[in-house]
A protein has these predicted regions:
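Generic structural signal for buried aliphatic residues
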Residues: 52, 67, 96, 140-141, ...
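Short, exposed beta-strand/loop patches in secreted or surface proteins that constitute
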Residues: 42-45, 88, 96-97, 132-133
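PP2C/PPM family metal-dependent serine/threonine protein phosphatase catalytic domain
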Residues: 107-128
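Beta-strand-rich cores of mature extracytoplasmic or soluble domains
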Residues: 121-171
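Residue-level recognition of short, solvent-exposed, well-ordered loop/turn junctions
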Residues: 47, 62, 91, 99, ...
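Generic structural detector for well-ordered beta-strands
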Residues: 53-55, 89, 134
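Mid-length scaffold segments of soluble, non-membrane domains
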Residues: 79, 83-111
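Protein maturation boundaries and topogenic segments
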Residues: 1-83, 99, 153-171
Length: 171
């Protein structure tokens, strides 16, 4: 009895098994490095993206790039641990300032402006959102490029341990 299949059906079945196995291994390798992220803030217009490919292997912060992170200060708007993606606007050593006229400056350069999500905050509480700070080691300032973005201008910097990976816009 030969172990080599002689019929066309048997050869076809072997090919299907090999292709299926290759697809499963490829899928597992892809999933171990990448995750698909859906922008939960699409209605707020935070960044021009609804779907992102997140590279979990690329966690080295680079200013100006989109990074996904686990939000830990976004309650009650979003649960702690919610995956978010924003532009990395400032890195350790950078100075971030939110001015009285609601301009957001990074090292003196305007990144964006506005704090529209504070419309219902009493005037006497607005001062806690205004100020200047120099980011410490492992602190990163995440900003959307739209005024209505819910980002670091409202809850401060994130820690390096919150970064999941670099985001690439799919659409």
């Amino acid at each position: 009895m030969s172990l080599i299949p002689s019929s066309g059906k048997a050869r076809w079945a072997i090919k299907v098994c090999v292709i299926t196995g290759c697809l499963m291994v490829s899928g597992a390798l892809f999933a171990s490095r990448f995750v698909i992220g859906v922008n939960p803030q699409s209605g707020l217009g935070c960044i021009d993206a609804n779907l992102l490919l997140i590279d979990k292997a690329d966690t080295t912060p680079k200013k100006g790039q989109i990074f996904a992170y686990r939000a830990m200060q976004a309650e009650p708007i979003y649960s702690n641990g919610t995956l978010m993606a924003k532009y990395l606007a400032a890195v350790p050593g950078d100075t971030v300032e939110v001015t009285r006229d609601y301009r957001i400056l990074v090292n003196g350069q305007e990144f964006t402006r506005g704090l529209p999500l504070l419309i219902d905050v009493p005037v006497d509480e607005l001062d806690r959102f205004i100020g200047r700070r120099t980011l410490q080691a492992d602190e990163y300032w995440m900003l959307g490029d739209k005024p209505r973005s819910f980002d670091s201008r409202y809850w401060g910097p994130i820690h390096a341990s919150q970064i999941v990976g670099r985001g690439y816009v799919i659409f």
